[in-house]
Regions:
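Secretory-pathway ectodomains
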Residues: 2-572
Length: 572
């Protein structure tokens, strides 16, 4: 009598005993291949063993009441079972029931633990929110000088100190000096942040140290001198500290306890590129831009040992050397402009005449001979090499999807719509917009299905529990991730209510049962509403208006944080 598993909601699993008398068991089905889909049900791993109940014997064991080897069973319709044998039979039956119930409890615990671990590491995933979340705690925390996430901790910078807050309580876990009040700890990324916590946090402090992601005009210039590099573990202990020469280089915390250095080298070459109109009113222009090469190095932050070094020759990257000058109405040329972003999965350098993306081991993801392309991280650790990320040079090249190790997977016949939230850290489906159609591909690049709807798909908000939540200009649609069949549809204005005519979806999260959509009025942007839609039906489970001014929502290790730039709060 096998067990049929069902979803009891709230992350629980229920079981039903199914009578299979007279049914044939096809054991070959157990080894049949199964499709892997993002958000699909997760089985208990093979090899999982269940403990026997106290006093129960393993199959085939000897003992009181056991039949001798080869003994025939009793005849059908035996008139009576002796009392002692009835007791033994009852004990065996009780043991079987206890074994089944115990096995179900072990399966339930293993499933719940697996689901929780997946929600803590998947993109945009949060723990179960059965009702509208309320503020659990609030604490001061500025994000303008980087953030880092250690297991159970949020790390930010306060003056000359790195400060860690407990994600569950908001209490200060530790506070450590990092060598100066001009410091950067952790990183910042323009892409969806990885939910996997780091093992250490790297801080860089020194005169002129500024977040390199500030794309202001004019951008900050690296200064000559030294910077203090500090490496902290999850307990706030200093596991490494040294003085690093800046020598005019950009220094930012890098992946896996690393420090990334980017600097201009050599002398400018001959001008390249199209003429630049620096003052149209006066008829002034320059014949292209002459710039210097760039060297990117990843060092061990604690020891300074070089992990890898790459040289990037100056190239004609469209519009990378100029910015609009409001005073002259022309273009301002900045041949030294340099930007650097480093996360746990990607090192990306850009600026005048340079654009390159690297894995943490130094492997280059973009095409060195295509100055306009660049890599963007996708859900599940994959990457999209966007052929026109840095602009267009007129050449027709397809975007490419790469595996986490950089292996090409698919030349994209359209635009990848990457989900903002999943319930699995290893997605098995890729969604691509091709004209007005939405196409799904598996992990090997084979097409699964095509959905031709009445409206053009503009975004994929959530892919979880076998459902893809897709957005158009005015609707939110639920699609079966296995077949592409539409299962439900909702109008965005209906979800926004009276306050949100013309509202747009700006963020999305999931707990594996619901899709949580953040709706914002584009006219004001000051207030928003969070709506929870059941993935299987699209029905509204709850909705809540979020007042109190601007504040972005951030999923971190299964928790949902609200950040307004100066304070952070836990919603739950």
């Amino acid at each position: 009598m096998p067990l049929r598993r069902g979803d009891g909601g709230d992350g629980r699993r229920t079981f039903e005993l199914v009578d299979t008398a007279g049914a044939d068991d096809d054991l070959d089905l157990l080894d049949a291949p199964h499709p892997v889909l993002l958000g699909g049900p997760h089985a208990v791993p093979r090899g999982t063993t269940f403990p026997l109940p106290p006093g129960a014997s393993a199959p085939g064991a000897s003992g009181p009441g056991a039949l001798p080897p080869g003994a025939p069973p009793g005849p059908p319709g035996a008139p009576r079972v002796p009392g002692r044998r009835r007791v033994v039979a009852a004990a065996v039956a009780t043991g079987v029931v206890v074994l089944v119930v115990g096995g179900m409890l072990v399966v339930d615990a293993a499933t719940s633990r697996d689901a929780r671990e997946r929600l803590e590491t998947a993109r945009g995933a949060v723990r179960a929110l059965d009702t509208a979340p309320t503020e659990q705690w609030r604490a001061p925390a500025a994000a303008d000088r980087g953030t880092a996430f250690l297991p159970g901790l949020l790390v930010t910078v306060d003056g000359d100190e790195a400060v860690a807050l407990d994600l569950d309580t908001g209490d200060e876990a530790w506070r450590v000096p990092v060598g100066g009040d001009e410091a950067v700890c952790g990183s910042w990324s323009p892409w969806e942040r990885s939910a996997v916590p780091s093992r250490t946090v790297v801080c860089v402090a020194g005169s002129g140290v500024t977040p390199s992601w500030y794309d202001v005009s004019p951008p900050p210039r690296p200064r000559e001198g030294t910077a203090t590099v500090t490496v902290l573990d999850a307990r706030g202990r200093v596991v490494g500290q040294r003085q690093a020469q800046t020598a005019g280089a950009l220094l930012v915390p890098g992946p896996d306890g690393g420090l990334v250095r980017a600097e201009r080298m050599g002398e400018p070459g001959e001008p390249s590129g199209a003429p630049v109109a620096v003052d149209p009113g006066a008829g002034e222009s320059v014949d292209g831009v002459a710039g210097r090469d760039v060297v990117v190095t990843l060092e061990d932050a604690a020891t300074g040992a070089v992990r890898w070094r790459r040289e990037l020759p100056f190239q004609d990257v469209p519009w990378s050397c100029t910015s609009w000058d409001a005073e002259t109405g022309g273009e301002e040329v900045d041949p030294e402009r340099l930007l650097l972003v480093a996360t746990e999965t990607l090192v990306d350098v850009g600026g005048c005449g340079v654009a390159a993306s690297f894995l943490p081991d130094g492997e280059r993801l973009d095409d060195p001979d295509a100055p306009t392309d660049g890599a963007v991280p996708l859900a599940g650790g994959r990457f999209l090499v966007d052929a026109d990320r840095q602009g267009s040079d007129g050449a027709l090249r397809a975007d490419r999807v790469l595996d986490p190790d950089g292996t090409p997977l698919l030349d994209v016949p359209g635009e990848v719509l990457d989900p903002q939230a999943t319930d699995d850290p290893a997605p098995g489906v890729l969604l691509v917009r091709d004209g007005i159609a939405l196409r799904a591909y598996d992990e090997q690049g084979a097409r699964l299905w095509t959905f031709d709807g009445a409206r053009v798909p503009e975004a994929v908000y959530v892919v979880a529990e076998g459902t893809a939540v897709v957005g158009t200009a005015s609707t939110v649609v639920g699609l079966d991730a296995l077949s592409g069949e539409q299962t439900w549809s909702r109008f965005v204005d209906d979800l926004a209510g009276e306050r949100g005519h013309g509202a747009v979806v700006t963020q999305a999260f999931t707990d594996g049962r619901c899709a949580f959509l953040v709706l914002v009025d584009p006219a004001t942007g000051a207030s928003s509403r969070v709506v929870a839609l059941e993935l299987s039906s699209g029905s509204v489970v709850w909705s809540e208006d979020l007042d109190g001014g601007w504040g972005g929502l951030l999923p971190v290790q299964g928790r949902l944080l609200r950040w307004d730039g100066q304070t952070v709060a836990l919603l739950g």
